Amino acid sequence: MRFRFESIKPSCVSGICRLALALVAFVPMGVSQEGVLPPLKDLGIVGDEPAEIVLKGVEFDGNTVFSDAELLELVKERLGKKVSIEELEGVRKAVSKHYVDHRYVNSGAVIDEQDLAGGILKIRIVEGYLDAVNVMNEGWLRSGYLRKRVHREVGKPLNLDDLKLALELIRRDEKIRKINTALVPGDELGQSHLDMIVTEKKVFDVGIGISNRRPPSVGAEEAEMFFGTKNLTSLGDTLRVNYTFTQEGMREIDFGDARNYSVFYSLPLTRWDTTLELGLTQSDYAILEEPFDALDIQSDTRMYSVALRQPIYRDFQHEFSVTLKGEHRRSEVLVSGERFSISPGSVDGQTRITALRISPEYVYRSQERVIAARTTFSFGLDKLDPIMTPDFDRKYFTWMTQASWVESVTKNDTLLIVKLLHQYTDQSVVSMEQFSLGGMNTIRGYRENQLIRDNALVISPELRIPVYKDRYGKPLVYLIPFFDFGTGWNTEGPKDRETIYSAGLGVTYNPSDYVNMAVYWGHAFKDFDIPNDDDLQDYGIHFQLRIGTDFWDPTHYIGPQK
């Protein structure tokens, strides 16, 4: 019996990207469509027995999925009655059909040679299994990575839905472009093999970008270079490196001593996608706005992190996972070359914290809707020599929520997107743990970091209206009317709750995965007294442009593996 699975590329239906798995089942080769076994007499079951017997009972052997009582329900109408040879075959078919209807496609019932004089029919259940996974092409990704993830989802007996889920989860992997598979019979009854042809995505990507996502006080514009790999050592590990050049206005790029970079590495540890994540971020800045530029204020911030991420539950629509992260941050501020405390909580210009963060995540996907939510519980630790003033508790607690709802609202791929950001703490926290409101990623129309508070709430609904599509119907240009609302307050101290909100329009252009352009203009409904209000952000303009490419396709066909 042969079943073929053909995987298609991710597609956008109603404007929402979904991962679709198409299944085409072929009639078993060498067997009639009805799947009738040879006559019972040829199997030696009947011998010299009469053409009909009184069926007093049925005994099952080898069944683990369904109980004897459940299988007897399928044939109870024939018990106590005279049955012919053909009707015995009908009993076998009914049991086999029950397995197939429940997606156990290589399981079924077998009637072996036996004595029916006592009226007891013995049926042997063959519960099929997946014996081998043959990767029929060779790429940079190790074939064991793929085999383990198939066997992770597929148990014994083999269920077609479990196999489809395993293939779907593999195809969602960012390293995989598409897969083609065929389920073929093995050498033994109930045994099946899975043949796979896996097309990997290109392994490396590189690019450049420019944006104005920094506070104008330190130079809003920045240029960046980025490099990444989806499979560094063929173990499925990823590496992302980003280097940023700060920019003073639009006039001069600072290639001096500034060190602004980030490095993130992740490595899957088990077939259950337990993943180790390591991170390093370095950020330097200098105050450039008058009159504070004369003070020569500089800051150096560094962050180290180590995390374990574990998916707990996954199916075609739902995914729930938990991340446990340890993070260490340190910051130093210099004024005219000397350490100086500017932000609350710092000691002699230095702040140092260590935190444990627990982050449950949930994702729901359907053709019309995507919902994603993450909540992070952060616990300050009195470890690795934390530095802060005595009025700040080293063992602090914060609770942050990030959520988004994407809904297809029209047939022309118009999307409604609602974003929610939230942070709560019952005590004052140092500035590196506070929440920033204002800027491209929170409240458009205001400066980046317009407000910095202990607690905050941001709600941002927007429509994404496609105004230009390619010849395949994929939206390339979206027009985005939006409304942003945010409020923030400190747990203690003089700054009361403050609310800002804006409305505006944006345009995005995404012709490929590695070309992304976005421009937003937002009207701020609240004015702030800013001495130097000549930055683009002061006019409500935010922009971002990233251009890159990927390279090195490692896939080539090698044929079946023994």
Predicted regions and their residues:
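Extracellular loop and loop/strand-boundary signature of outer-membrane beta-barrel proteins
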Residues: 155, 212-213, 246-251, 290-296, ...
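Transmembrane beta-strand segments of outer-membrane beta-barrel domains in Gram-negative
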Residues: 205, 268, 273-429, 559-562
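Outer-membrane beta-barrel "beta-signal"
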Residues: 227, 536-562
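Transmembrane beta-barrel strands of outer-membrane/channel proteins
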Residues: 183, 208-212, 225, 239-245, ...
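Outer membrane beta-barrel transmembrane domains
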Residues: 287-289, 325, 329-346, 355, ...
